[in-house]
């Protein structure tokens, strides 16, 4: 499991006093208001930044970090990812998982036959869809429904599913 989770990306400066515009990579952008600090991933090197303020503008988050007080300083952070440590991550309900924790798990059908590896999760609004790549590099799209996904075991590195009839036809 990853120790740090991506929650956003700094995409541009905002104003001249060091604020940054960010996109959210979480289900709930309002979570940024509760954060006291985050880590900025500068090409693999994590630096902790205290948050002085958060506001929202259209679909973006405007963040003010302590010590970033000019457009020039903010410019240096553009493009980097915002991360939180797992201890400060949102607490998930039972049988819910962070996408980053399940990417890479092996997916097996009801006969314990390997279908492939989970490569991505498409969030459709109604239900997620697992993108599974088989050994021939073909993609299988599996709805992430309780009736389909029977077990997720991060410890064992596997997901067990019962495929809907006709899905592989």
From Swiss-Prot:
GO-annotated cellular components: cytoplasm; ribosome
InterPro entries per UniProt: PRC_barrel-like_sf, PRC_RimM, RimM, RimM_N, RimM_N_sf, Transl_B-barrel_sf
Xref: NCBIfam families: 16S_RimM (TIGR02273)
Subcellular location: Cytoplasm
Gene Ontology BP annotations: ribosomal small subunit biogenesis; rRNA processing
Disulfide bonds: none
Domain commentary: The PRC barrel domain binds ribosomal protein uS19.
Assembly notes: Binds ribosomal protein uS19.
PANTHER family with a match to the protein in the record: RIBOSOME MATURATION FACTOR RIMM
Function as written in the Swiss-Prot or TrEMBL entry: An accessory protein needed during the final step in the assembly of 30S ribosomal subunit, possibly for assembly of the head region. Essential for efficient processing of 16S rRNA. May be needed both before and after RbfA during the maturation of 16S rRNA. It has affinity for free ribosomal 30S subunits but not for 70S ribosomes.
GO molecular function: ribosome binding
Main location: cytoplasm
Domain PRC barrel residues, every copy: 93-167
Protein's name in the database: Ribosome maturation factor RimM
Keywords associated with the record: Chaperone, Cytoplasm, Ribosome biogenesis, rRNA processing
